[in-house]
Amino acid sequence: MNGLFFAGDLGQRIFQLPFSWKSLGVDIRGRSRTLHINYRTSHQIRMQADLLLGPDVSDVDGNTEERRGTVSVFNGPAPAIRSLVDDDEEIAVVATWLKARMNEGMPAHEIGIFVRSEVEMTRARAATEAAALPYRVLDEKVETTVGFASLSTMHLAKGLEFRAVSLMACDDEIIPLQSRIESVADSADLEEVYNTERHLLYVACTRARDHLLITSVEPGSEFLEDLRVASAKT
């Protein structure tokens, strides 16, 4: 066991069943440390995303990850959060934003557009096509293609990185997903649903290196209030 090295981020646990190292005979309590230098995400995006989770995140083994004190090595524009009146307005806003990134000379494969589930993919396709941006919809292989923007659900976005990310359809009852909330009766299970939905939005936000746009059709997700607080502080 002394030859094993593990790296992870408790904030990126997006599936409901918690994973326990201890149950596999690996006890990392007192043998771990938190890394506080972020080389991938701008200060502005990291600050926004971290406020979704709070200052500490714990796992089922009792390990706590301290999120305060982390610093990014570069700055960027503040994340943009827009709540629109209908799908058409959202599509137009996202298309304009995508065109701006292309006009800056950003390659298409440096752009990602993500939604909560397949149901909302129509909105992402419409915005990308309105911007005349070539794209590919990611499958379970999660392979990006040079010259094409990537469209996918937030779950498939985990592990990817883009210079610019648009998160669409962050509406009420979409994130957190209403069907998941209604499927549980126990308060502990309900808390776990909310936590994993928050983590999912965190993962989606932190796919962005430099530019982040988050849009919803009113009423927006309750999580957007946390994001707006973060944006106001940057």
Map each language-model feature to its residues.
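C-terminal/domain-terminus segments
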Residues: 215-234
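Conserved helicase motor core of SF1/SF2 NTP-dependent helicases
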Residues: 1-136, 141-149, 154-184, 195, ...
